[in-house]
Amino acid sequence: MVADLGGWPMVEGSRWLEDRTGTWWQLSSKLRQLGLSPNYIVDVSVASDLRDSSRRVISLDQPSLGLAREQLMQGRDHPTIRAAAKYMIDIARMLGADQRTVREEVDKVMDFHIKLASITQTREERRDTSLLYNPMTISEISRLNPDTPWLEYINSLLEGMRVNGNERVVVHAPDFVEKLNALLRETPDRVQVS
């Protein structure tokens, strides 16, 4: 399955080609087509509208981090973060990663996770649900975060339907979406898809 998705950069090493895997959002789309729910960079779903339960609406939220935000914010030296990095190294080695470079690759991925956590809202900031209801069109989201092709990405996730730039999306964390643009711009694709 990993090979079908274009390979894992930390296993493929210098043989990894971006055009086989694509960007984070293209990989996310491929994973969704396989029945998985990839929400490691953003969480896109269709759910009941919180203000009108008779309607369904596309929802865009910050990701479910694989590790607790509080632990990630303490950096790579936190015991849980070290354990997660060791686990990632062990899996990559079992799949054939280069022993000399895998640690550096994992460090970059963990640093990305830490930076991603730093732009998410805390649990306390998310307690006021009225602040989590920010209807925007896909075109407006694209202005907040212009480097991600939001219309193409959202359409790739929707089975059997297509939307346009005027489609209303409930954005739960607009600040996150905006800050994500800068983070993705500074992070190599091979780190984003790892």
PLM regions: where:
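Noncatalytic, helix-rich "gating/capping" subdomain that lines the substrate-entry/channel surface
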Residues: 1-194
